[in-house]
Amino acid sequence: MRVAIVGASGAVGQEFLRVLDERNFPIDELLLFGSQRSAGTKYTFRGKEIEVKLLQHNDDFKGVDIAFTSAGGGTSKDFAETITKHGAVMIDNSSAFRMDEDVPLVVPECNAQDALNRPRGIIANPNCTTIMMVVALQALENISHIRRIHVASYQAASGAGAA
C-alpha cells in the first residue's frame, strides 16, 4: 500500500508516523509532504530514511492509496483535488471538511461504516474533544437511548498540536 502524510513535520504528522509504525500498518511505500520550510527534512521510518517533499499541485499522489493530511484547513481545501484526483482516499485531520455533506465525519469506534460512502474521496474526523465524547456516549447509547446531552468544552488557544 502506498501511503502519504501531508504535514509530516508537524506534531500531528509525527504522531501519524509513530502510530502507523506502532500498529504495523501495511505500507509498501511512504511519501512525506510538507511546506517549503520542511521540504528536504529527513525522517526514519522502519529503518528507511525518507525525505519530505514539497507539497505541490502535480501528480505526486498518483498511485497513492491513502493520504493522511494534517497541514491545516486551508492546505487541505487547496490540495484536496490534487490528492484525490488519482483515487487516493484523503483522511483529513483539519476542520476543512467537517461540515461538508459529501464528506463523511467518522469516528471509527462509532460509525466506521460511514467511511465507505465518500463521494469526494475524503474522510474527515471531528474535533478531538468530540471524538472522546462520542466514543463514551456510544457505549452508553448501546445500553440505553440517550435523548439529550448538554456539553461545554474548553479548547486550547492554539490547535497547532505543540506548545
Residue ranges and their predicted role:
Residues 1-163:
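N-terminal Rossmann-like NAD(P) cofactor-binding subdomain of oxidoreductases
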